[in-house]
Amino acid sequence: MAVYKISGNKELFGTVEISAAKNAVLPVIFCSILTSECLVIENVPLISDVICALEIISELGGSYDWAGDTLKIYGGTMHASRITEPAERMRASILCLGPMLARFGSVQLALPGGCRIGARPVDLHIKGLSAMGAEIKIEQGILKASADGLKGGEICLDFPSVGATENLIMASCLADGETVIVNAAQEPEVCDLARLLIKMGADIRGAGEDTLYIKGTAGLHGTRHTPIPDRIEAGTFMTCAAACGGEVRLKRLCPAHLKAVSSKLMECGAIITELEDELIIRREGELKAADVRSLPYPGFPTDLQSQFAALACSAKGTSVIVDTVFEGRNNHVPELLRMGADIMQQEQATIVRGGGLLGGAAVNAPDLRAGAALIIAGLSAKEGAIVEDCGHIDRGYYRLCEKLKAIGAEIERLEEGEQGSAKQGRGGVGGRRPPGRA
């Protein structure tokens, strides 16, 4: 498993180009199930979750060509199937459930995996699709679903789940009649999915609002689509720039998608200039503490609360970070403790008493966003860090090390077999590692 070797306490200057959003690309890939024609997706990042999604497409009988950053998916040879190992590796694999039921009427799917960040049940997906006429049961870790034609109706979600909203939108496009989704997610990625489906011939109204109306059609056709920029990648670089100081320009993003993040970072002392599809962030003075409560969009993203905790470690004062979306998203806390952070967990709240530079340590990336938080912590620490188990980080960040180096970060990715020097250097950065930890 690869590790990141980081030297810290250095300001960042330069330009970063933001990739297409992982959380937009994945549902777009599964949209290819809904048509027998070719779907062309542009600006696709080569990250492990995308590769996993394409393995699922292959298991379903589909094929694809990937040239540069353009992906062509051919769904004409797809068929009902049983998907096991790839589904177990990625949470978003559940998004093939609705399209498969809509087009083929059956699918068997291993219960999805992904980051371990608390309870992430699939009950909203099952409840919504069952209301459309699907029969779904779980046997020995396999989700078995069938439907003799899905039927529209009104579905009220108990929580505005992004994944459940996306699954129901895709299923509704080929259902009989009109489907109304109440308390739908309003995230930009949901709007991007609706934009693609409309180009494919779907009849969708209300994207970006809390109630969606979808009229089923006889079939969808292929098209070409460029997913929206990754607001979480952008927010990660914004937080990193604020934590380290300096001035960073972010290109190919949508500033409107980052209002909650920009507002909170400015409260901490960052200076942000918004342009049409760019953003400049700089921080010259002292960081100030701020409280954060993660909420569904347009609130502060749950996918950025771990990174904000890393920033809060060096901000003067006490920050309280509450995640209202995932109750167990605190895997970064024990790792930041290894670096000397004054941080504690109280139920859903993470309390950070900041004000000084973190020390160095060898830490483990327990999930995607916690891994990003540890990189930010290492870059802003006085002694840097070694971040192990980088496979989680690879799931969601494209060329992260290369992009960080371009703005002056001293970071090196070491593959297995190249890690001798990093491990020998742990007297400096790994002194806080407890005995017996592998």
Where are the regions a protein language model picked out?
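Short, structured segments at the rim of ligand-binding sites
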Residues: 1-438
